[in-house]
Amino acid sequence: MSFDDDGKTPTALVRIAKSNGQLIGRIEKVLDAQSETTCSKCLDDRKNQSMVGLEIIRGAKHDAQNGQWIQGRILDPDDGTEYRLVIEPQSAGQVLVIRGYWGVFWRTQIWRKQGP
């Protein structure tokens, strides 16, 4: 489950899976009834695609040395901005520390696994 920047407000259910040795993440369900239904602000092939099914994590590769997933990209569908990405699994994969970088700036979100 992804959360807003306040870390308390759930925004979406995101399914994260391996595909061809990389992690991808797709929105499975939007939890905010006020949010847009399509990614109108996206600038690439995701422009105007439905939020449900939208691939927001692309290309993260496993770094066995430190256990992180690196060199990926994460999309903020609210404003269409794409960030460099590092994912650090914690608590046996039940928690993901998601860090997006834009230049020298970054922000971190904590995502929690839902269901089986």
Regions found by a protein language model. Name each.
Residues 65-73, 93-97:
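Short, hydrophobic/aromatic-rich segments at coil-to-beta transitions
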Residues 10-62, 95-104:
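N-terminal glycine/threonine-rich, aromatic-flanked beta-hairpin/loop signature
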Residues 1-10, 23, 27, 70-72, ...:
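Tryptophan-anchored aromatic micro-motifs
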Residues 81-82:
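A charge-rich, low-complexity, intrinsically flexible signal that marks solvent-exposed coils, linkers
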Residues 73-74, 86:
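Functional cores of ribonucleases/endoribonucleases
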Residues 3-5, 17, 75-77, 99-101:
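A generic structural motif
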Residues 93, 101-116:
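Edge beta-strand at a domain terminus
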